[in-house]
């Protein structure tokens, strides 16, 4: 039994993350136990489908936004022990190895090519969310991770469910591991993105549209893709300042897009060349992946967007993710991965982090 207010490790996708237990459903007492009392008008948010004869835990992932807080069953969490911390590190290393192996296959025209199996036809690598190993239990289906039937069971790489207004996108492991690396490089190594990126978001999305256009004969489908690409560009440019940057990166963003007169005078020629450009013309594929990772939450909060429109967005996001897997070696080759970033000075860190 895990204590309310205590720390643990929790599976989110194939990896383990440190988390804090905020609430606990106690089946013996038949009530929710809290570490902090609920605010006025706040509900406990117990899932209707949960088995009330078992313990459930409402957790907050350390360093994540509170919007990712969720109820999980006991098979999703582990004690915060040295042995389990080592397991956490091992899973990260395995994800990195899988990423490199997949990149090599993609480069050699192997199983990652479209229609050739590999990452596109793997069993759901997010199965950890429903317990351990590859087990797909009924609880996973109830949460919409592995729909058992219906029109939303579109692929093994990602699945989504509108039944409880909870949308999910499962990012292929090769891309997910890159997001893990990205997080570590920015938050641990204190590096920020080199701007402009040689393959900025808008260029990537334009290439995606052109590739789809060469294979699509339906004018209606092509129009939908064009609208999707346009909308995603707008989402990116609007969201990056508030939602997509780590704390260390925000100062750079402010200096580029909202410089003070003093900062403008001190700009280098390269920094001046960034003036007037949109974020989508400067940031690269990893920041696009950050957007995709929170896209379900953004769509869930869009008032007035109907199910059909959301379904179209998710369907094209699935196509975009698979397209990125096929071309990630071109967009972010391993040998130049580190050049995506630049070191920060102690002065920059002090201002950016408020030290």
From Swiss-Prot:
It is found in: Nucleus. Residues 131-144 have a biased composition (Basic and acidic residues). Residues 163-353 form the MRG domain. The keyword Secreted does not apply. It comes from the Eukaryota. SUPFAM superfamilies: Chromo domain-like. Keywords: Chromatin regulator, DNA damage, DNA repair, Nucleus, Transcription, Transcription regulation. One of its GO terms (cellular component) is nucleosome disassembly/reassembly complex. Residues 3-77 form the Tudor-knot domain. Residues 98-150 are annotated as: Disordered. GO terms for biological process: DNA repair; DNA replication-dependent chromatin assembly; negative regulation of antisense RNA transcription; nucleosome disassembly; positive regulation of transcription elongation by RNA polymerase II; regulation of DNA-templated DNA replication initiation; regulation of RNA stability; transcription elongation by RNA polymerase II. GO terms for molecular function: histone reader activity; methylated histone binding. Belongs to the MRG family. Involved in deacetylation of histones, chromatin assembly and chromosome segregation. May act as a transcriptional oscillator, directing histone deacetylases to specific chromosomal domains. Component of the NuA4 histone acetyltransferase complex which is involved in transcriptional activation of selected genes principally by acetylation of nucleosomal histone H4 and H2A. The NuA4 complex is also involved in DNA repair. Component of the NuA4 histone acetyltransferase complex. This is Chromatin modification-related protein EAF3. The gene is EAF3.
